[in-house]
């Protein structure tokens, strides 16, 4: 697929592991590849990301992408948070009905902005709802996923990953 779309000459692209997600209407579809199915794809995508000639910020982007594909591969293989997840701290989601989720994979409401006058702060700062319980669950590694959006936030807040990316960029 990647090579078939090369004629479009995109400056950049990203792929993401298909997952069952409430907001995408894919629950029960069994679309997530097995670790064995995804591993060679992740290796291929990482190698392509590292081989792309790039300068400036694009070098960092490609280095983070190469790291993301390997992280996603490990999450699928190990079925655990390979690096700590920051969902509910670094990111959150508001569903169309006003439910606040720490993460769209779990899609578990921790509050509803309709009940707080559309003010996120009481929910986010744990004055109402159960954001504290969700954060505790996530920190306790009770979940794991390879979702790109969450993974990039997690990688940016994970010192060893940032150091690896920096080393790849400087060492290239």
Predicted regions and their residues:
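Flexible mid-to-C-terminal extensions adjoining Fe-S/redox cofactors in radical SAM and related proteins
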Residues: 80-82, 99-172
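Radical SAM enzyme [4Fe-4S]-AdoMet core and its adjacent flexible, acidic
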Residues: 1-101, 105-115, 157-158
């Amino acid at each position: 697929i990647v090579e078939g779309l090369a004629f479009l000459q995109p400056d950049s692209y990203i792929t993401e592991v298909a997952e069952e997600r409430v907001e995408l209407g894919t629950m029960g579809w069994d679309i997530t590849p097995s670790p064995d199915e995804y591993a060679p794809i992740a290796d291929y995508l990482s190698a392509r990301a590292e081989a792309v000639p790039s300068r400036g910020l694009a070098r960092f982007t490609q280095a983070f992408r190469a790291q993301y594909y390997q992280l996603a591969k490990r999450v699928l293989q190990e079925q655990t948070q390979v690096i700590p997840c920051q969902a509910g701290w670094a990111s959150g989601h508001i569903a169309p009905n006003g439910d606040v989720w720490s993460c769209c994979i779990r899609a578990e409401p921790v509050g509803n902005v309709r009940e707080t006058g559309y003010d996120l702060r009481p929910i986010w700062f744990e004055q109402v709802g159960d954001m504290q319980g969700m954060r505790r669950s996530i920190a306790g590694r009770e979940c794991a996923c390879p979702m790109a959006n969450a993974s990039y936030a997690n990688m940016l807040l994970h010192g060893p990953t940032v150091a690896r990316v920096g080393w790849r960029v400087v060492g290239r």
